[in-house]
Amino acid sequence: PKHCSIYSGLSYADIEKYLRCTDFIIKPISGHGARNTYHIASERQFNDLDISNPHEYEAEEYIDGELYHIDSVMVNGVILYSQSFEYSYPCIEYKKGKVISSIELDDTSALSEALSRYNLEILSAIGGTHVTHLEVFVKDGDIIFLEIAGRPPGGGLVPLHRITHGIDLANIAMRFQMDPYYVPSIANQRLKYG
């Protein structure tokens, strides 16, 4: 989505003009989940925010779409493992008491295949050796990049991958840090249905 940096003295009107929208998200540049993340839909909401370090935040266009994540293992630019999931709700809905969960997509579905191609395109541009967590929105059939992290997913997703596919993304990420030549053995087989 369109986005801009936050700094002292920035007004709602400034953000509205730059993003060309009245609905936007304020979130930390370096964060996880929906911690310290705010959906702003009015000037009053923006003015009521109490952000002590504005330079650590950004504003981005609010997208009303379905949120997905693709978790991957890549070695020397080659994807060894990738799995797509739909979030039950966008992560910010957790603040409203909604339970956030991930629903694994059927690998053969058209959407899963489209997300896999998109993930390949993004990761090909990045290259290297990583565990990644890519988040995208899908709105009216379009895939919209939200963010990517060079780390395993949060929440209960590491155990989910371990239980369902026998892949421990946290362990793999740690091994990548310790041994630049480490190549995990990945069978990518479904072990258990939940």
Regions found by a protein language model. Name each.
Residues 19-21, 139-144:
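A short, glycine/Asx- and small/polar-enriched loop/turn
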Residues 35, 129-133:
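Short secondary-structure junction motifs
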Residues 54-55, 126-129:
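Short secondary-structure junctions
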Residues 61-127, 138, 145, 149-177, ...:
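ATP-dependent carboxylate/phosphate-activation module, predominantly the ATP-grasp catalytic core
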